[in-house]
Regions:
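The feature marks the mature, well-folded catalytic cores of soluble enzymes
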Residues: 1-199
Length: 199
């Protein structure tokens, strides 16, 4: 073993050893961080604030009853003249009611669907939560709802239940963490409007 390999091996072992030891802090107790939204000017109506701030972020917000969801989606898609849809396996909508000449489920690796993904005109995704203080939708990227669904098509329809609006990023993340048995997912998207996605 040459000197460089020897130093690299020692460094690697030292770093890994420190990482293992860092998780064993005696007496450490996790606590929720202070919510910085206290410093943001908000209203007493998170839903209305959410809709206003989403509109400010260039979302086109539509409100509808669950019974009219597919009809509302069809109206939106028709207004753009789109007919090629891509969706995740976890969509949980009646796809027979969605007017699209072509519907592709994103349930395979991107390498197998690359040509289809980038030639789809619209997608439909579920948001886990909305954040009223920022007007953003929080999505959990997963195999059932790949991140690419919100990026590749020209139009991404984000479905958000009214009772899933939180007043801050911290409260939305804490709620998602509670939903996930105390652990956050490895990939979370905050969508703030067209071409404004952060993970």
């Amino acid at each position: 073993m040459n000197r460089i390999d020897e130093i690299s091996t020692k460094s690697k072992e030292m770093i890994l050893s420190r990482l293992k030891d860092s998780y064993k802090i005696a007496g450490f107790e996790s606590s929720n961080s202070i919510d910085p939204v206290e410093h943001v000017q908000t209203t007493n109506n998170p839903l209305e604030e959410m809709k206003q701030k989403m509109s400010d972020n260039k979302y086109i917000v539509h409100e509808c009853d669950p019974s009219a969801l597919e009809d509302t989606i069809n109206e939106i898609v028709a207004s753009y003249g789109y007919s090629k849809m891509i969706y995740g396996s976890g969509l949980n909508l009646n796809l027979d009611k969605i007017n699209a000449s072509s519907k592709i489920c994103f349930d395979k690796p991107i390498e197998e669907l690359r040509a289809d993904v980038f030639h789809r005109e619209f997608s439909i995704v579920h948001a886990e939560y909305g954040v009223s203080s920022h007007g953003v939708a929080l999505l959990k990227s997963s195999q059932a709802q790949p991140r690419m669904l919100s990026l590749a098509p020209n139009l991404c329809i984000v479905l958000l239940k009214k009772d899933r609006v939180k007043n801050s990023l911290a409260s939305a993340l804490n709620a998602l963490k509670a939903d996930q048995n105390g652990k956050l997912p490895s990939n979370i998207l905050f969508i703030a409007g067209p071409s404004r996605t952060a993970d």
